[in-house]
Structure formats: structure tokens, C-alpha cells
């Protein structure tokens, strides 16, 4: 069984993660992309308008990009073809239906907890300390939790397979977690609002505490891109693109694929609606009191939030749906959030198949 879990072009390389002959791999490939221009000669290749076009294969991604940039604004010289070369690579290297298996992928849910000395944590000014990080493997159900204190499980988390790593301070917590991440690097990371809170705050705080550039280690290719994304009412928030790791925020999946409008999208409300269960109550007036006065329950609160997202996936299969759509279109998992990218990939797939007939 051979399938990709991630593919994109970067410079002159195609960066790829996947499974080959049942084993996981990570690699960088040279690739010769193809673009098309109008032709006066008969050709099996056609534009979307039915015009004859001829292929130009380039020696590298950079050469193709330079050609495109040189002629893109020239009148009467249209350039055809997919300029996102990762899609070209996928279509060429994985012809026919992609046979994939989610059980061979590393799919994790994540939840973090921080201090709240100065209100809600701010990704752009990550001054609140990391207290707890939990990851759950969707396939094995193994839970790995890192916390700055000792922890003894109670009946609140009875039956869960928990590996708790007690850390003496935040520096140790982030160091140990990052080492663990590198050894178990996800193909897909999900959580509730994880793309706009858990992941960006984790990376921002890692860089502040462990040192400049250390957050790049979350990428198997050591490539991380910080960017601003539009949120509600035109507000901008900071997010991080982790090259090689797909972020499928379960809140975003739920909003996109359930086709219902909920009166609230808080995790507690969705958990009660979909699973008939709730988050663990703190029993304190403030979050600060919670982690200061009942550390054990605080850790369980974090673990249960992580498990709820995993249980939502077990019931609703929205991550699996996103994977199915991505493999049908032969694009990356994250691309399913963009109708344009998904349809671009479908169009490339359709025209490639038509040219081969």
C-alpha cells in the first residue's frame, strides 16, 4: 500500500510524507513540472476552451515559476496548467485511485492549558506559562500528558490509557514535549479551536522559552510559516502553518461538514449535543483558582477535553471525511477547507485523465 499524507513544492524540491509498502517515509524529491501554451498544431492536450495547447516541461520548479512570472501579464499569451506543483507531483506519482489507510496515519487530538495571570493567553504576546499538554492517538487511544506537577488519576478518567510525564518546570515540559513530538510527529493534528489557539500558542511559547527557531522543530521539514488569518467580523488572528503536518481543527470541520447551525460552538455544548456528555466542571470561580487549588482535577479537565474531540471523531468521522475528499481530489488534507484548491485539484485530475484517453 502506497499513499502520500503530505506533498508540496518548496524551492526546487517536492516535500513528501507518506506510506510506501506499509512503512512511513519522509523525503524531498526533484520534480520537473509541466505548463501549457497555445499551439497551432493538433494536440491531444486542450484548454478549457477546447483550444490546442502544447506542453512545456521544465527542469525545476524554479524554472517553471520564472517562466510563468515572465509571461503571466503578456497579452495573448495565456499559460495553462496547474502552477501548484505539489498537485502535479501527486497526480503523476499516484495515478489511479489512491489506496489509503487511516490506521497507518498518525492522527492526534491536542489540548493545552496555560496560566491566566493576565486574562486569556495572547498568541502575539505569549506571556502566560504552559501548564499541561495532552495528545491522544486516534488509532490506539493512547493518551500522553505533560504537566508541571505530579498527577494521580481518579475515577474521572477511569479506563483511559494515560501516560503522564511530570515536569519540574515549563522549560522541561516544553523540551520533553517537543522531543516526544519529533518522535511521534503527527500527519494530522486536531482539537477544538486548535488552529487558532492551541497550536499557535504552543509554537509561540516554545520559541519564547526554548529559543529562537526552536518552534520550527514541530515541522518534520523544519519549515514553519506564521501568518494572519481573517476571523469573525474581519478580526485577524495569528496562525502557524507547519509544513508536513495537516491541521484539521475539529471546530472548523464541524462547522463545514455538519450543515447545521448551533446556538453555541463551545466544546461543552457540542459534546452534550453530539455525545450526551459534558466537560469536567472546575468547581472554582476563576481558572486561576482551579489550577492553583486542585491541580489533579485540572489535569483531568485537560485530558477529558482532549478525549471529547477524539470521541467526536469516533462518532462523526469528520477527519476521515476530509481525508476521503483529499484523496479523491488528490490534494492535501488542509486543502478541503478551500473550495478553490479542491476544485483546482479535481480539474487537474480530470484533464490529466482526459489527455491519457
Residue ranges and their predicted role:
Residues 2-44, 93-188:
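Conserved RNase H-like, two-metal-ion catalytic cores of nucleic-acid enzymes
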Residues 45-108, 112-117:
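Long, highly charged low-complexity segments
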Residues 142-148, 152-164, 168, 185, ...:
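Active-site-proximal helix-loop-helix substrate-binding element of RNase H-like nuclease domains
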Residues 353-357:
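A short, hydrophobic C-terminal helix/tail in secreted or cell-surface proteins
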Residues 118, 196-201:
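Short catalytic/ligand-binding loop motif for oxyanion handling, primarily in non-cytosolic enzymes
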Residues 123-127, 200-213, 326-330, 342:
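Short secondary-structure boundary/capping segments
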Residues 285-352:
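Common nucleic-acid-contacting/processivity interface regions adjacent to the catalytic cores
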Amino acid at each position: 500500500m502506497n499513499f502520500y499524507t503530505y506533498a508540496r513544492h518548496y524551492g526546487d524540491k517536492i516535500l513528501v510524507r507518506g506510506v510506501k509498502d506499509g512503512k512511513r517515509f519522509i523525503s524531498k524529491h526533484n520534480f520537473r513540472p509541466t505548463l501549457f501554451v497555445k499551439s497551432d498544431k493538433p494536440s491531444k492536450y486542450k484548454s478549457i476552451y477546447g483550444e490546442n495547447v502544447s506542453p512545456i516541461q521544465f527542469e525545476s520548479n524554479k524554472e517553471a515559476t520564472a517562466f510563468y512570472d515572465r509571461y503571466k501579464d503578456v497579452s495573448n499569451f495565456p499559460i495553462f496548467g496547474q502552477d501548484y506543483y505539489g498537485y502535479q507531483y501527486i497526480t503523476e506519482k499516484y495515478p489511479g485511485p489512491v489506496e489509503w489507510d487511516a490506521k497507518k496515519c498518525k492522527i492526534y487530538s491536542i489540548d493545552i492549558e496555560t496560566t491566566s495571570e493576565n486574562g486569556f493567553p495572547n498568541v502575539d504576546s505569549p506571556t502566560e506559562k504552559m501548564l499541561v499538554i495532552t495528545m491522544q492517538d486516534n488509532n490506539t487511544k493512547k493518551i500522553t500528558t505533560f504537566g508541571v506537577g505530579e498527577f494521580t488519576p481518579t475515577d474521572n478518567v477511569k479506563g483511559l490509557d494515560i501516560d503522564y510525564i511530570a515536569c519540574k518546570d515549563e522549560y522541561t515540559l516544553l523540551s520533553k514535549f517537543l522531543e516526544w513530538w519529533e518522535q511521534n510527529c503527527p500527519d494530522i493534528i486536531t482539537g477544538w479551536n486548535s488552529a487558532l489557539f492551541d497550536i499557535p500558542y504552543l509554537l509561540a511559547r516554545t520559541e519564547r522559552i526554548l529559543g529562537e527557531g526552536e518552534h520550527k522543530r514541530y515541522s518534520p521539514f523544519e519549515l514553519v510559516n506564521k501568518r494572519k488569518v481573517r476571523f469573525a467580523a474581519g478580526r485577524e488572528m495569528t496562525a502557524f502553518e507547519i509544513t508536513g503536518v495537516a491541521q484539521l481543527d475539529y471546530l472548523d470541520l464541524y462547522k463545514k461538514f455538519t450543515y447545521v447551525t448551533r446556538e453555541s460552538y463551545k466544546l461543552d455544548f457540542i459534546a452534550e449535543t453530539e455525545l450526551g456528555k459534558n466537560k469536567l466542571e472546575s468547581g472554582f470561580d476563576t481558572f486561576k483558582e482551579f489550577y492553583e487549588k486542585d491541580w489533579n482535577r485540572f489535569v483531568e479537565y485537560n485530558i477529558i477535553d482532549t478525549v471529547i474531540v477524539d470521541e467526536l471523531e469516533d462518532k462523526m468521522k469528520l477527519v476521515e471525511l476530509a481525508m476521503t475528499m483529499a484523496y479523491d481530489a488528490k490534494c492535501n488534507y488542509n486543502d478541503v477547507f478551500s473550495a478553490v484548491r479542491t476544485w483546482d485539484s479535481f480539474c487537474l485530475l480530470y484533464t490529466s485523465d482526459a489527455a491519457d484517453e
